[in-house]
Structures are given as C-alpha cells and as structure tokens.
Amino acid sequence: MSATLDAPGIRLQVAELLALREGVFQVGRPHPESRRPGAVPAKAAGAGMDLREIRDFAEGDDARRIDPAATARTGTPHVRSFYEDRDDTLLLIADFRLPMLWGTGATLRSVRAARAAVRRGWQAAARGASVAAMSINAAGVAVIPIGSGLQQMSRISHMLARWHDQALDIGGEGPPLAQALLRAGRLAPPGAEVLIVTNAEGFAETEESALAKLARRRHVRVLVPLDPIDAVPPPQPMPIHAGALGKFARLRPVDHTSLAQRLRTLNVHFEAAGDDAG
C-alpha cells in the first residue's frame, strides 16, 4: 500500500469511527417486551399483547414469535408483531464503489460517507435502537446483521474500514446498487429506517423498482456527501479529459433538484451533506 493511500482522509480508520460516539452515547432506557434488537415499547408495560401484523421474518427477529400457520401457508418464515412493541431499527448502507473513491479536498467522498453513516449509527445506538450495516464495493456486498450497543457499532466500524481498504486496493465499478437494496429488504424489518450514503449518480433508473420496494414499508433516506467542487467550483475554466479527448469548461454547482424530485415519487427522502459533514 502506498503512503498516499495511507494518508488521513484517504485511508478510513476504525479509531476515527469509534471516536464519533463521543457526546452522543447514553445509557438507561425502558426495555421492550420483545427480545428482538431494536424493538422499543410503544405503550406502558402491561398494556396488552394485541396482534399488530404478521410479517416476513427478518434477521434478528425472535424465533419464538414465528407464526406456524402463516409460515406453513407461504413456505417462508413469518413472525407475529404486537402493538406493545415498535421497531426502532436503522440500516446503514455505505457505497464504496469507484465513483465514491475521489475528492478534491482533504477527504475522499467515501470516507465522508462512512463518517456520516457511523455518526447516524451512534445516534441510533444512543437511543437504544438496533443498527445493521451494509457496504458495497467492487467485490460485492458486506453485511453486519441487526444488533445493538457498543459492540455492534464496533463491529460496524471495523467492517466499514476493512471494506473501504479493499475498495482502495481493488478499485473497479462493482455491482449495481440494486443488489444491496434487495438484500436490505430482507435485512430491515417493516418500520425500520434505512440510510443509503452514495453519490448522485448512484441510482440508475433501472434500480428504481428495487428502491421503491424497499421504501414501501420502511423510512428510506438517501444521503449524498458533497465534494467542495460540487458546491463551490473554481471560477476559471478547468481541463476535462475523457480518454484521448480533452477540453476546457466552466463547472457549475451540482443541482440535485431533479434527483430529489425523482426520489420523492418513490417515497424516499433526499439529503445533501456539505464537505464538513464528515
């Protein structure tokens, strides 16, 4: 590995991700009746066990709540969900494919993406929620199933740093984001929050159906970390090269209006984060 790749802002460090918990992690909160990580009490204890729904089994669900009849009827595991519990689960998806591995400032866009995702993860862990994580790079998709607490955030931080190292070493475009979205649908239970940190070009129109399906019963948000040149491009013409072709052109600030509108039709929220967000 070259010294350049090991420079701060390029090589993602586990220590910096763990340090993001300072000031946000708290202890002491009511425990839900459910043993599934991320379930929080929606009503006071003893308020009853009214059936809310029967849904697909998700990683981390309590196997004791499997509904035998629905499972036998559909051929896939289904669980019962009750009104005394509600899901407080956050799934983080960090995109480390080639378009994220660059930056004109001191930090790669991919590093800021990881920092932004982990910061949201620490905030969720602080309120007692469960957190899961996925990362996509040229090698495929890595997954940390649902869990909670300090150890879970440590596992997520180590996975992201390791997967980012791999992304820097192998480069390449990687699989379509839809591959991660389909797995996310199996990992995140209904009612969960899903944060996808990617670039503005991360979603092809052919992937909209997978994104819409994920957002059908979940709260999905797309976060795009902005590079300095995205928000404040230099005033002078810049050289632009595409293979043997090249020319000078003036750059304009990136406008995400059309992307935000497109995502809104899919019931997905859009957020752009400035260079200082990571």
What is the predicted role of each segment?
Residues 50, 70-72, 76:
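Contiguous, often N-terminal, cationic amphipathic patches that form binding interfaces
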Residues 46:
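Glycine/proline-rich, flexible active-site/cofactor-binding loop segments
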Residues 63-65:
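N-terminal juxtadomain amphipathic helix
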